[in-house]
Regions:
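Short, small-residue-rich loop/turn micro-motifs
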Residues: 1-4, 93-95, 160, 243
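Short histidine/acidic/glycine/proline-rich micro-motifs that form metal-
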Residues: 41, 132-136, 163-171
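Auxiliary Fe-S-binding modules of radical SAM enzymes
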Residues: 147-151, 158-297
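Active-site catalytic pocket residues across diverse enzymes, especially alpha/beta-hydrolases
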Residues: 4, 58, 255
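Short, flexible helix/strand-to-coil boundary loops that buttress conserved ligand/catalytic motifs
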Residues: 1, 78, 105, 243, ...
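Short, solvent-exposed loop/turn segments at secondary-structure junctions
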Residues: 8, 75, 165-166
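Canonical Radical SAM [4Fe-4S] cluster-binding loop centered on the CxxxCxxC motif
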Residues: 1-14
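Radical SAM/AdoMet-radical enzyme domain recognition
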Residues: 13-36, 44-159
């Protein structure tokens, strides 16, 4: 699953101040929720200045600031995130077996992530675990992950692998339809559709025996595009209307030279052409060549 990552020149990346400026424009247009993701957002130098600035917008146009992280730096940031106004985070965790976790993450330290989760809970953050379901890799851990999450009072969301970006290993070999996973879980647990709605693509179910909740993100078996109200902004200022399309506008230069009006015009163009649905197909070529780390999960 190795990805050949290439770092960008600093001048091509939005400064933290520019990110705040862009956020203010988006909030003025009606955006009520901002999610910081990656890559790994906590790896950005000075990221807490951005978090603090956005946290000050909560209650002044912004309803919620949330974060998706791989958890490797979470232990040192959890308290500061809560102090800045973050109340919910997602942690990507595809395995709780150290050797397997290291393989999936290409050398990651599982204990470091688990300490981060503990620190987040101690700081008062609500934590949801995101687990990509991978056939022949971690499918034997799904039930135990659900039980662990229930014991830790964490929600769990399972995600189908997506044909996105160029990778060295064929994703088709590891595609695991979540309707299959759901049927397996229903052999042991009672799953009742939840009334919880987060505005995201996940469909939630209450797990009665565990008094917990599980979500399913199914871009392939059950297309979720009809309810999409999201755009994705890369660190370069490129804005994508859809995770599974290359439809985009470039805001960096407009932000630096033209200001809010120029940015608004580009956003209007993007939203007018927002695709009705993605083009993900298992067995086909990747819908887009960019890595998930460019736009986040």
């Amino acid at each position: 699953m190795a990805e050949r990552m290439q770092f960008l020149p600093k001048r091509e990346i939005l400064t933290l101040e520019e990110m705040v400026m862009l956020s203010d424009i988006l909030i003025s247009r009606g955006v009520r929720k901002i999610r910081l993701t990656g890559g790994e957002p906590l790896g950005r130098k000075g990221v807490m200045e951005l978090v603090k600035a956005l946290g000050q917008r909560i209650g002044a146009g912004l309803d919620e600031l949330v974060l998706t992280t791989n958890g490797t730096r979470l232990e040192g940031f959890a308290g500061a995130l809560h102090d800045a106004g973050v109340r919910r985070i997602n942690v990507s965790l595809d395995s709780r077996r150290p050797e397997r976790f290291g393989h999936i993450t290409r050398g990651g330290d599982l204990n470091q992530v688990l300490r981060g989760i503990d620190a987040a809970l101690a700081a008062g953050l609500s934590v949801k675990i995101n687990m990509v379901a991978l056939a022949k890799i971690n499918e034997d851990e799904i039930e135990s992950m659900l039980s662990w999450c229930a014991a830790m009072a964490l929600d769990l969301t399972l995600i189908e692998t997506m044909p996105l970006g160029q990778v060295e290993e064929d994703r088709t070999a590891h595609y695991l339809p979540l309707d299959v996973v759901k049927r397996r879980l229903e052999d042991r647990f009672t799953l009742v559709p939840s009334t919880i709605r987060t505005g995201g693509p996940s469909r939630y179910y209450e797990v009665l025996e565990l008094r917990s909740r599980i979500g399913f993100i199914t871009p392939l078996t059950n297309n979720f595009c009809e309810g999409c109200n999201r755009i994705r902004i890369a660190a370069t200022g490129t804005v994508y209307g859809c995770l599974g399309h290359d439809q985009k506008v470039e805001l960096r230069d407009a932000l630096r030279s033209g200001g809010a009006q120029s940015v608004d015009e580009l956003l209007d163009r993007l939203l007018a052409g927002k695709p009705r649905r993605h083009d993900f197909r298992i067995g086909g070529a990747p819908a887009v060549a960019r890595h998930m780390s460019v736009t986040g999960g």
